[in-house]
Amino acid sequence: EEIKDEFLPRIAKGDTCSMDLTEPDAGSDLQAVQLKATYNEKDGLWYLTGVKRFITNGDAHIKLVLARSEEGTNDGRGLSYFVVDNKHDSRILVRRIENKLGIKGSPTCELVFNNVPAKLVGSRRLGLIKYVMSLMNGARLGIGAQSVGLSSAAYNEALAYARDRRQFGKAIIEFPAVFEML
């Protein structure tokens, strides 16, 4: 509840968010995540150190980060989920911004975390098993809907153009090659 009270009002006001999962040596194998989370008993915070890659909205204000909280583990049971308030200081370095074909309004970044303070979301060891899997399933639905919407809009644009564009005295939709494509 404390995390909700702190971050949800900011999200409602327009602060951006990111889900920082992928790493250079892990790729889609999230059980191989190595970004290290170390707990500091003095201030009650966790500190994150390591690299994330291909992070959509990598420069976001609020970051949800999957990190290895359990020393000596090498599977999903050693991962926890953290929320980071990105102060846009030198502790999170945007090392690279990908040059993408589309969706340029959302930077895809490589990030270096340098002892970044974070708060644990939920329970330790459930980062991948419970929290990330739940978020990813929702994200997959959103990506599917976005893809259907974009392809439908592209088709409708092409169809309207083919009906309006005239060549050799007729709409190009009447040419068999164009008609077959649409």
Can you annotate each of these PLM segments?
Residues 45-92:
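A short core secondary-structure module
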Residues 32-39, 66-67, 111, 115:
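Short beta-strand elements
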Residues 2-35, 39, 44:
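Internal maturation/activation junctions in enzymes
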Residues 25-28, 54-57, 73, 100-107:
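Short Gly/Pro-enriched turn/cap motifs at secondary-structure boundaries
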Residues 19, 37, 48-50, 82, ...:
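Buried hydrophobic positions in well-ordered alpha/beta secondary-structure cores of metabolic enzymes
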Residues 90, 95, 110-139, 156-174:
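A glycine-rich, basic-preceded beta-loop-alpha segment at the flavin cofactor/substrate interface
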Residues 13-14, 29-30, 40-42, 112, ...:
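Alpha-helical interface subdomain recognition
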Residues 28-34, 57-61, 75-77, 93-96, ...:
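Short acidic, glycine/serine/threonine-rich loops at helix termini
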